[in-house]
Every structure is written in C-alpha cells, then in structure tokens.
Amino acid sequence: ALLADGTGLITIQNFNSRCADEAIAAVDALREQGAERLVFDVRNNGGGFLDELTRLLDYLLPEGPIFISRDRAGHEEITNSDADCVELPMAVLVNADTYSAAEFFAAELQEQGAAVIVGEPTSGKGYSQQTFPLPHGGAVAISTGAYFTGSGASLIGTGLTLDAEVYNTGAEDAQLAAALELLEIR
C-alpha cells in the first residue's frame, strides 16, 4: 500500500514459497507509484525458507555477504548479494512474534545501514532445527545448525537490536508511527 506521505508499506506474513517474488513485485509497484521510502511489516512472521529470505535481501541490498549458515560440523555457507539494490530509506516493524528468517531480514537491512528496526524485542531464533516425531504423538526438535548475519553476528538469545522500542497498546499503530518519524529524520 502507498500511504499518503509517500511511504510504501509491505506486509510479509512469512518467508514461504513465492514470498520473495511477491515482495519484489510489491516494491517495484510502489517505486513506480512514487514511493519515497519503504516500511516492511514482519510482525507475527514466524520465518520460513532461507532461499526466499536471501533472494529478497539480494534484491534490496548492495554487493557483499548477506547471510551465513554453519552446520554442526562447522562448515559455513556464505550467501552474497550482487551490486543491484534498492536505494530508498527503509524501516522494519517487528514484535515478540517475529522469528527466524524474519529476524534475519530485519537484522541484515539494519546491519548494512539500509533500515531502522522499530517495535518489540524478538526472541533470537538463529538456528535451524530438524523435528523428529515420537511414537505417542509428540515430537523432539534438535538444532542442526546456526545462522548469522553477513558480518557474522548471531541473534541467538539476544534477538534484534531495536532502533526504537515501541509497543502497540491502543487502536493506533504506534510502531508504524514511530517508524515513519524515524524515516523523516534520516
């Protein structure tokens, strides 16, 4: 949606199939409509597929490392972005239900100076898990690897570093209002 002040607002509900294509199409459409800044809403986003995350980050960010995964044996895989990028001020809205790929989306945009992060502290789910079903209906999830930002920063146990910690307590979206205010300052 293009807001009256020229801000493009894009909600990303998860990083599952086609997320990157849909978000890229939304950014392109908003830019064609004259968006002067972008706000990505990843509140209540539980994460998803890493290839969707890295495709979207590659589209948004300039050349360089954007994501690192390390398996239990210590083998690292570094994902890099190409030189093409979106040069608009950006903000990312997060809350306590923003997890995994959604956290890394916000963290990498912030780390590269492309976006500010506004909202509530996140959990810091920075690892991959494999789930094994148990015979009586339960399941056990075992961590099989860890994730890092392009510079090697971990989110495990810390979550995101917020540029503005803001809670929505009433009918107004105070987090969006704070993000818009921060983008005006930039």
Task: Please place each PLM-identified region on the residue numbering.
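Short, acidic, Ser/Thr-enriched surface-loop or helix-capping motifs
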Residues: 149
